[in-house]
Regions:
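Class I S-adenosyl-L-methionine
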Residues: 1, 6-15, 35, 63-93, 98-267, ...
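Short, hydrophobic/glycine-enriched beta-strand segments
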Residues: 1-9, 33-34, 93-97, 245-247
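SAM cofactor-binding core of SAM-dependent methyltransferases
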Residues: 3-61
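Active-site beta-strand/loop signature of hydrolases that rely on acidic residues for catalysis
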Residues: 9, 33-35, 56, 128, ...
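Short, well-ordered alpha-helices that flank and scaffold nucleotide-derived cofactor binding pockets
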Residues: 15-19, 46, 130-133, 307-310, ...
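Catalytic phosphate/metal-binding cores of nucleic-acid and nucleotide-processing enzymes, i.e., regions
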Residues: 124, 128, 277, 289-293, ...
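FAD-binding beta-loop-beta segment adjacent to the flavin cofactor pocket
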Residues: 260-286
């Protein structure tokens, strides 16, 4: 089985496959990752060294004439000039979460327009769509934020399936509503596991210290003695059951929430962020706190992806468990 993961990040998709008993040795089962962020690639290769990294999605091309996938291709004069061959044959499954900055409601919070599919970042969706049409895999999965109604309709039409809205809070303590477009049959919304942040709150002194920022005027405003600032964009989650949606930066407003720490506050620790995304504990211990925030916030909630993959008719797939 060949899986092509576009905008792979830290390989949350690969973790989900692993939890279903499917591992990638690079021979029988092959996992190809398109990613350009160095810390994300570093994390993936640390945990999954058999992953084939292919770089920029814009330079990937499946050539039907040779029945092979190529990287570092050049598109010129309305055709592709082939680069280095990655693998013979075509992927059985394509997965990915194209960058969502232009869809995100955070743009409106920061006074920016929600550009949808017209935005520079979200235009990478069309690269996903291009490869989907070139390869025509058996199954595909696309994840994105909760988009506007008109953008949702456009994406439904482009992908010829209706996106399913699943909130990560059903399977973890993080509120993270996302749309998932897939042709995997009969996917349903998972049942609520009623998981509370209070059962996972980190008490490790070093990790809590690491996530407690220095006092500055802007951070004092964000915390506002636990009142979350004037516009309540930084919620006090000290006693909350759920935390806000993880983003790539905790040190900003809005964020996932702030926690009372002594006479001051802290952000989520790296352990709390990992568990909010149902990542393996310690998955990002090799990174700095800020680097961990970046790649974890960019990632998927693994157990949501596992839930979706569980509906794949595995008896039809050429994979080894």
């Amino acid at each position: 089985m060949i899986v092509l993961s576009l905008f792979d990040g830290i390989s949350c998709g690969q973790i989900a496959f692993e939890r279903l008993g499917i591992t990638f040795d690079g021979v029988n089962n092959v996992y190809i990752a398109s990613e350009i962020k160095k810390n994300a690639i570093k994390t993936t290769q640390l945990h999954y060294p058999n992953t084939i990294q292919v770089g920029d999605v814009c330079k990937l091309h499946y050539d039907s004439a040779t029945n092979a996938l190529y990287k570092d291709c050049v598109f010129k004069d309305n055709k592709y000039y082939l680069g280095e061959k990655v693998i013979d044959g075509k992927p059985d499954i394509i997965i990915g979460g194209s960058p969502c900055q232009n869809f995100s409601s955070l743009r409106a919070t920061n006074g920016l327009a929600i550009d949808g599919l017209r935005g520079d970042k979200s235009k990478l969706f069309y690269e996903y769509l291009r490869l989907l049409k070139e390869i025509e895999p058996k199954y595909f999965l696309l994840e994105n934020v909760k988009v506007k109604k008109q953008d949702k309709k456009m994406l439904d039409n482009y992908l010829d399936v209706e996106g399913i809205l699943i909130d990560s809070k059903l399977l973890t303590y993080q509120t993270r509503a996302r749309y998932y477009w897939t042709n995997i049959p009969n996917v349903t919304v998972p049942e609520d596991k009623h998981i509370s942040f209070q059962d996972y709150k980190d008490t490790n002194i070093e990790r809590c210290k690491e996530s407690s920022p220095n006092r500055t005027p802007s951070r004092i405003t964000m915390w506002a003695n636990g009142n979350g600032g004037d516009n309540k964009t930084c919620k006090n989650i000290t006693h909350a059951d759920k935390v806000g949606c993880l983003s790539t930066k905790q040190d900003r407003a809005p964020n996932s929430g702030m926690i009372q720490y002594g006479d001051w506050c802290r952000y989520l620790t790296r352990r709390e962020m990992e568990q909010a995304q149902t990542l393996p504990i310690g998955y990002c211990d090799h990174l700095s706190y800020r680097q961990a925030c970046d790649v974890i916030g960019d990632g998927w909630t693994v157990d949501v992806i596992k839930h979706i993959f569980n509906f794949i008719p595995w008896e039809e797939m050429k994979c080894q468990k």
